[in-house]
């Protein structure tokens, strides 16, 4: 996978990841949501998760055509049992442990 600078410059990697997990920060939040997310959707990445460590929260999206649809939003100690792209249970508050 390409690093952020290469992806921003428009270079293309071979293949598409099954999952992108983007850690939000105040400095890059707008870029992550309004630039990075649509780029991965256009590339065909089936799963995109946004992680907000400040809340803490996880918002998961699944590809529907060429855009993402939100499939889950969990905060704090609330568990989420993801099925795709693989089975895993996530508790946002425990991401900081």
Regions found by a protein language model. Give the residues of each.
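C-terminal interaction segment
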Residues: 1-43, 47-97
């Amino acid at each position: 996978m390409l690093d952020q600078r290469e992806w921003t410059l428009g270079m293309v990697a071979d293949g598409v990841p099954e999952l992108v997990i983007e850690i939000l920060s105040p400095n890059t939040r707008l870029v992550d949501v309004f630039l990075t997310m649509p780029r991965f959707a256009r590339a065909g990445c089936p799963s995109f998760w946004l992680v907000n460590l400040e809340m803490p929260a996880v918002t998961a999206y699944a590809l529907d055509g060429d855009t993402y649809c939100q499939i889950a939003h969990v905060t704090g100690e609330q568990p989420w049992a993801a099925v795709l792209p693989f089975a895993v249970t996530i508790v946002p508050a425990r991401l900081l442990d």
